[in-house]
């Protein structure tokens, strides 16, 4: 899922 991936990256940042 692209949305989940983006959320993960944002959280990691």
Swiss-Prot record:
Keywords: Apoplast, Manganese, Metal-binding, Secreted. It is found in: Secreted, Extracellular space, Apoplast. This is Germin-like protein 1. Its main location: secreted. One of its GO terms (cellular component) is apoplast. The keyword Secreted applies. It comes from the Eukaryota. It comes from Betula pendula (European white birch). Oligomer (believed to be a pentamer but probably hexamer). May play a role in plant defense. Probably has no oxalate oxidase activity even if the active site is conserved. Belongs to the germin family. GO terms for molecular function: metal ion binding.
């Amino acid at each position: 899922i692209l949305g989940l991936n983006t959320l993960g990256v944002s959280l990691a940042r």
